[in-house]
């Protein structure tokens, strides 16, 4: 099921309120990868195995299957893999931030200008168009209404290490419960990925 995208807003919120860098700096590595990188064999082969499902979605097909009609339709290992639309979206967010900075806005306000462009501006318009074109139900109002929520984490101490996870709306508590179970076993003595090790972890999870 598709949900209102929260990752861009979450990143902007955390960076604006708790970070020191600009959005341009933070997004630079992602933009570099989106502009093209040599794809690894594992990812390329995974795309090839899932190509029939990918073909059901025209935009995904365009990105992930550059050799449609050939025996192998996914990228070859080492082939330059590009996500041009992702690069454009990230560039628009950076552009919004940089324009805000030129107007004299603070670092925080400039980052939130990028946030607004994603959730209320032309990015939102294009997102909704593409979503609804494919039968999705997300509206511009859904995007405009989305807000990040800060909440207290939950945690356990596993063998002297504090492990923090989000609350019950995620699988976080299940992982913490598994760690509580595994606290009673000496996994190290079993040998990493040994039969006994895998069986014990599997049973706990």
Regions found by a protein language model. Give the residues of each.
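Feature marks proteins synthesized as precursors that undergo proteolytic processing into two chains
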Residues: 1-205
């Amino acid at each position: 099921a598709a949900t209102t995208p929260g990752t861009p807003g979450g990143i902007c919120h955390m960076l604006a309120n708790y970070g020191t860098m600009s959005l341009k700096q933070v997004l630079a590595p992602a933009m570099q990868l989106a502009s093209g990188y040599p794809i690894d064999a594992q990812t390329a082969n995974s795309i090839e195995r899932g190509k029939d499902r990918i073909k059901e979605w025209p935009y995904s097909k365009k990105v992930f299957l550059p050799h449609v009609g050939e025996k192998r339709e996914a990228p070859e290992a080492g082939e330059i893999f590009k996500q041009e639309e992702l690069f454009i979206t990230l560039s628009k967010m950076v552009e919004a931030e940089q324009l805000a900075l030129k107007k004299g806005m603070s670092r925080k306000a400039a980052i939130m200008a990028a946030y607004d462009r994603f959730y209320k501006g032309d990015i939102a318009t294009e997102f909704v168009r593409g979503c609804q074109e494919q039968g999705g139900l997300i509206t511009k109002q859904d995007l405009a209404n989305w807000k990040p929520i800060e909440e207290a984490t939950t945690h356990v101490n596993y063998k002297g290490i504090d492990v923090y996870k989000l609350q019950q709306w995620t699988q976080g508590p299940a992982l913490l419960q598994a760690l509580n179970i595994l606290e009673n076993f000496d996994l190290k003595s079993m040998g990493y990925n040994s039969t006994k090790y895998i069986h014990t972890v599997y049973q706990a999870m």
